[in-house]
């Protein structure tokens, strides 16, 4: 009986090691995965991928209407524009380290593809998980929060299109909502729609002009821009994939700080119907 218990324990340890060391399911698979297959692997933060040999084209008919579905944007690199210590130098983008590792991908975005008079296409974003709250850390230790988003994106291609292929690029602008909501209260209890009007050590200085920006909170909507370059096309399934580069402002602490300029690069996937 003693040996049987040892054998059972040994087999349990071996099974645990095999489970822990086994490869996670490939993110490019189109099969439906279970929760247990996804949990702890990071696949929920990955966009589907097309094979390297996908170099076809998707024919377009201007008399028909098209929809772009399942648009997924997976960031891979983050950069923040830093002002130099020397005024003679120009501001440069500095690479940042992602702190919110498993919650950075925009997914399931959909919208209409409309033909224009010059045979270009315009994509208008309508719905989807179109924002993610992200924080990156700069080499000096500073942490920069921002709302990675493509809300209300309107992007246009070059004119004279008869198909979607690897030469097609989308460029457009979008809205960047406030990182914090209007009901958020800062550590001193100040907010946009609730909280104190001011919170300073000396009440007589509450209306000081130097403190107005900190005391008067604002949930501002700013602007961003993005470009998407198609690199892979599967004409049989209507799938496209490629790379993107987005530029947008960072969090402003409800208007108390100047926004930093953030650049995001990564890969995208979508399906045309």
Swiss-Prot record:
PSII is composed of 1 copy each of membrane proteins PsbA, PsbB, PsbC, PsbD, PsbE, PsbF, PsbH, PsbI, PsbJ, PsbK, PsbL, PsbM, PsbT, PsbX, PsbY, PsbZ, Psb30/Ycf12, peripheral proteins PsbO, CyanoQ (PsbQ), PsbU, PsbV and a large number of cofactors. It forms dimeric complexes. It comes from Nostoc sp. (strain PCC 7120 / SAG 25.82 / UTEX 2576). Keywords: Manganese, Membrane, Photosynthesis, Photosystem II, Signal, Thylakoid. One of the extrinsic, lumenal subunits of photosystem II (PSII), which stabilize and protect the oxygen-evolving complex. PSII is a light-driven water plastoquinone oxidoreductase, using light energy to abstract electrons from H(2)O, generating a proton gradient subsequently used for ATP formation. Required for dimerization of PSII and for binding of PsbQ to PSII. It is a peripheral membrane protein. This is Photosystem II extrinsic protein O. It is found in: Cellular thylakoid membrane. Pfam families: MSP. GO terms for biological process: photosystem II assembly; photosystem II stabilization. Coiled coil: none annotated. GO terms for cellular component: photosystem II oxygen evolving complex; plasma membrane-derived thylakoid membrane. InterPro entries: OMP/PagP_b-brl, PsbO. Belongs to the PsbO family. The gene is psbO. Residues 1-26 form the signal peptide. One of its GO terms (molecular function) is oxygen evolving activity.
